[in-house]
């Protein structure tokens, strides 16, 4: 069975192309100059969002002040709108890493090459491989700073919970770091609009948002929560690969212990 899983993983990685997920936490919020310097290679929608966010870079803001500058959706490298930004996480990089590790989430491999090597090592050690990479999506003009996955190893190719996280350019009113996140659950594999194999997501993305919260609460890592509804909430949309999804439009704010 493990040999079959490994072969399937190789096939999946081959058709999926480059699937990178940077795992390093940035040391500081990007400055307006840094954000603008990325504009030549930034997807169009992300570029517009980065400009509005850059104007507030480094400032302490209430969430009411943040929402107008917070992009509602992430984009693909080509600029196609994708997943909804449905989470804001308040805490240091150490708190984020500790909280999600305690809650059972793992960081996926960063590159296809890493995945192949890791899969071989796990197979030789008679262990299941669960760290398959996730694709790059963009927010604030850059790909995700890191990501987390949660899924049974035997099902992880087709089914898993996962989310991407970006450090925002601003701080909350108390001076704490704020992270924006987009979480969805993969429930199968399908061909996208270009004919490439990709994951199919659960259309009710609120389920994943609330599942992420539940895992953190079960681990005792949540200090407080609140839900925010933007003036222009995302109720229904289509991912960059053509999947439809729906939401109540609320963004969950999680304050970590």
Name these PLM-found stretches.
Residues 18-35:
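Signal peptide processing junction and immediate N-terminal pro/mature segment
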Residues 7-20:
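Bacterial N-terminal signal peptides
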Residues 111-257:
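A cross-kingdom signal targeting lumenal/periplasmic-facing segments of multi-pass membrane
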Residues 69-99:
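Terminal, regulation- and interaction-focused segments at domain boundaries
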Residues 92-109, 114:
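Primarily extracytoplasmic ectodomains and periplasmic/lumenal surface modules that are beta-strand-rich
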Residues 1-4:
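Positively charged n-region of N-terminal signal peptides that target proteins for export
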Residues 43-78:
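Compositionally biased P/S/T/G-rich terminal and signal peptide-adjacent segments
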Residues 83-85, 103, 161:
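Envelope-exposed proteins and targeting segments
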């Amino acid at each position: 069975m493990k040999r079959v899983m490994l072969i399937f993983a190789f096939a999946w990685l081959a058709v999926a192309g480059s699937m990178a997920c940077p795992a390093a936490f940035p040391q500081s919020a990007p400055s307006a100059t840094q954000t603008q310097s990325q504009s030549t290679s930034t997807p169009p929608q992300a570029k517009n969002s980065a400009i509005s966010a850059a104007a507030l870079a480094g400032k302490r803001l209430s969430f009411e002040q943040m929402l107008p500058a917070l992009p509602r959706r992430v984009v693909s490298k080509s600029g196609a709108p994708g997943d909804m930004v449905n989470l804001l996480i308040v805490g240091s990089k150490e708190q984020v890493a500790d909280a999600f590790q305690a809650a059972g989430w793992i960081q996926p491999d960063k590159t296809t090459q890493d995945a192949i090597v890791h899969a071989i090592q796990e197979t030789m050690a008679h262990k299941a491989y669960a760290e398959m990479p996730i694709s790059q999506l963009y927010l604030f003009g850059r790909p995700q700073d890191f990501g987390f996955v949660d899924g049974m190893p035997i099902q992880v190719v087709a089914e898993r919970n996962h989310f991407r996280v970006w450090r925002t350019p601003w701080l909350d009113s108390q001076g704490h770091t704020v992270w924006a996140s987009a979480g969805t659950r993969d429930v199968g594999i399908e061909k996208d609009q270009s004919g490439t194999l990709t994951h199919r997501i659960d259309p009710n993305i609120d389920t994943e948002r609330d599942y992420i919260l539940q895992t953190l609460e079960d681990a005792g890592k949540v200090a407080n929560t609140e839900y925010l509804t933007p003036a222009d909430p995302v109720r229904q949309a289509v991912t960059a690969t053509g999947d439809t999804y729906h939401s109540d439009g609320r963004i969950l704010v999680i304050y970590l212990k």
